Amino acid sequence: MNTNDSVITDYTSTDDAAVVRLSDGKIILQTVDFFTPIVDDPYTFGQISAANSLSDIYAMGGKPLFALNIVAFPIQKLSNTILSEIMQGGADKAAEAGIPIVGGHSIDDNEPKYGLVVTGEAIEKNIWTNAGAKPGDHLILTKPIGTGIISTAIKKEKASQAVTDSASESMKELNKKASEVAQHLQPNAVTDVTGFGLVGHLIEVCNASNVSANIDFKEIEFLHGAIDLVNEGIMPGGSKRNLDHAENFTTFSSKLSFNQKLLLCDAQTSGGLLISIQPKDAEKFLNEFGGKAKKIGEIEPRRVNPVTINF
């Protein structure tokens, strides 16, 4: 446990970024993320990884300031052109976010890895955490899910080009607009949906907020091809582990199949924001943001299980 009074959130919480208090109500946010390629195109991989790294700042209501590259690359095995394309993808996505990449660190490694350290800023009274959800709130999810299943299918050469393109477009999309729209409406809790899957991150919100959530499966949107692929047996190991964990804290409708439950727990890369917000503001958000954002459920008083999935 960190005893420094300037530290607001750190590794002991399940929030999306480290937050340190400066002065005059200002705070610094910092996060780091990197991973191995999940698509074949180097430039697209760089874009996706950068968008994923930036997401944690947006999920806390912060404004990114600058970033550093983290690079691992097998310099003796792969062409420098591939590395240049990866880093160009990251640089272009950072530019879209309005920030520079000002440095970084690289090592020789057996497998390519790429990501960013991102530093952001915010006003302390305005930051979001996952601990403020209140009974009566509506839950909004801003992107479809299914990237883990599709990424696994890409590696197995089981994904069509149309499915790959759809998932890549979703993963490349910054959560910038969603965060900016939400900042006008003061949501009660926000997180981004990433490695623990939708249900896993929702469990974190409910436990941190001492509430429960009621989700309508039929309102959740899945990426093109994700349902077909899981029905064909494409099941990422991380997503299965997520489901094993979620079943200890979730009441799943008996009408849901194993594959449907797995989709809800699919580990995401550069997923959307999960927003807990008052009903009147939820409607405003959906009208202003547009896109593929949907209301997927509501927050309720605490029950034994933090999450219930209806069908």
Over which residues does each language-model region extend?
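Small-aliphatic-rich amphipathic alpha-helix that forms the alpha element of a beta-alpha
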Residues: 42-68, 85-96, 174-186, 196-205
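Glycine-/charge-enriched secondary-structure boundary and capping motifs
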Residues: 75-100, 107-112, 184-185, 194-311
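Active-site glycine-rich loop that binds ribose-phosphate moieties when present
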Residues: 117-127, 161-182, 256-258
